[in-house]
Amino acid sequence: MELKDYYAIMGVKPTDDLKTIKTAYRRLARKYHPDVSKEPDAEARFKEVAEAWEVLSDEQRRAEYDQMWQHRNDPQFSRQFQHGDGQSFNAEDFDDIFSSIFGQHARQSRQRPATRGHDIEIEVAVFLEETLTEHKRTISYNLPVYNAFGMIEQEIPKTLNVKIPAGVGNGQRIRLKGQGTPGENGGPNGDLWLVIHIAPHPLFDIVGQDLEIVVPVSPWEAALGAKVTVPTLKESILLTIPPGSQAGQRLRVKGKGLVSKKQTGDLYAVLKIVMPPKPDENTAALWQQLADAQSSFEPRKDWGKA
């Protein structure tokens, strides 16, 4: 299996902290998201960045990955390696650690009559927009071939055309019967499990079946009310901002969230009041007039009150 340089993919150093890596991830996710990027390889780069983040954002996975990367060129790596506690590390453990990072289960086989083949688990990145309808996907994975000692002797590339149903959720598992490793002595094949990973979106956050989007509005739009154009997963809509709206206020748009077999979620627009740039003399005078007209308004009067 190829061990990718996740730090290089993220443009960070192995010594960088999680905050730095998270910042790099958010920047790259926005840069390469297919809805935003015009680069021809944007989707592939986006999935690569998401894969790197999946490992580096988890403290245990990152530690295991760092250990593997350090010894990647060691010819004895797959046979004799040392855990941090000094215990022996052999090829059986290698599969366990590698699967903990890449989400694959390559368990050591045992010689038994009519033994069932191993299951294989792979992660499939799905964009939010793709969850609305059933779509076809071509997936590629490696089919392990085990020797008589239950160790992986080689891996055979395999490609399948699969259907991803509408309404899939993050972490959902889809079973493809018989697409795992072959059974032994007439035993049934293992299964292939597709684990759905909903890719981060530059605009929407997922909250259960609902979606949240931050909607920037001007102070006068919040004060006077307005109608603003807001994107949804399907199309743009005209959202009514009520007069006197506050920063952080949530406006519900029914039926514009995620779709599943049981229900359709809602979209919540979270208002963010954005101030204009530093005012010139004329604009400052207008703000002062407003301040004078609202001199009795005290925004901090309820501080410290239950």
Curated annotation (Swiss-Prot):
Keyword Glycosyltransferase on entry: no
PROSITE patterns given in the database record: DNAJ_1 (PS00636), DNAJ_2 (PS50076)
GO molecular function, one term: bent DNA binding
Pfam family, one: DnaJ
Predominant place of localization: cytoplasm
Domain of life: Bacteria
Residue span(s) of domain J: 5-69
Compartments where found: Cytoplasm, Nucleoid
Keyword Transmembrane: no
A GO BP annotation: chaperone cofactor-dependent protein refolding
One of the record's GO cellular component terms: cytoplasm
Keyword terms of this UniProt record: Chaperone, Cytoplasm, DNA-binding
Known role: DNA-binding protein that preferentially recognizes a curved DNA sequence. It is probably a functional analog of DnaJ; displays overlapping activities with DnaJ, but functions under different conditions, probably acting as a molecular chaperone in an adaptive response to environmental stresses other than heat shock. Lacks autonomous chaperone activity; binds native substrates and targets them for recognition by DnaK. Its activity is inhibited by the binding of CbpM.
Protein name in the entry: Curved DNA-binding protein
Protein source organism: Escherichia coli O7:K1 (strain IAI39 / ExPEC)
